[in-house]
């Protein structure tokens, strides 16, 4: 259950409509997912979040779009964000992720989680070669 109520007709606010229109244009889709409807309860939060998402996730960069979605999905799994897991897994699939890639991705996430817990519990000292200053 949400902690806020999504605005009934958010696009009557011109600032919200501008964000939603930009989302539609950027994604080449008429679909506005619930995240944006619920963030519309606060126009400034909506604008800032979309600005950051657009900058990081949609602009050409050194990482390809599928890799970005997989990173986002991995962090979402680590943070137990069910909504984000679903939305970014769907986005990864739309960017070409296969079932085999998804299975491999989940194996890596699982392995990283397990070894992170082991190393946190054991408090293994960090090798000096892994420090940036040693490079």
Which residues make up each language-model segment?
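Hydrophobic alpha-helical segments
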Residues: 1-135
């Amino acid at each position: 259950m949400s902690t806020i109520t999504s605005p009934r007709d958010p696009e009557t606010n011109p600032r919200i409509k501008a964000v939603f229109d930009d989302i539609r244009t950027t994604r080449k889709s008429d679909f506005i997912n619930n995240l944006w409807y619920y963030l519309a309860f606060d126009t400034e939060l909506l604008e800032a979040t979309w600005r950051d998402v657009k900058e990081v996730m949609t602009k050409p960069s050194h990482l390809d779009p599928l890799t970005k979605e997989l990173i986002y999905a991995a962090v979402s799994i680590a943070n137990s964000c069910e909504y984000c897991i679903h939305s970014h897994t769907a986005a990864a699939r739309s960017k070409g992720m296969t079932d085999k890639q998804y299975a491999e991705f989940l194996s890596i996430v699982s392995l990283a989680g397990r070894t992170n817990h082991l190393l946190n519990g054991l408090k293994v000292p960090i090798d000096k070669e892994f420090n940036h200053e040693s490079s």
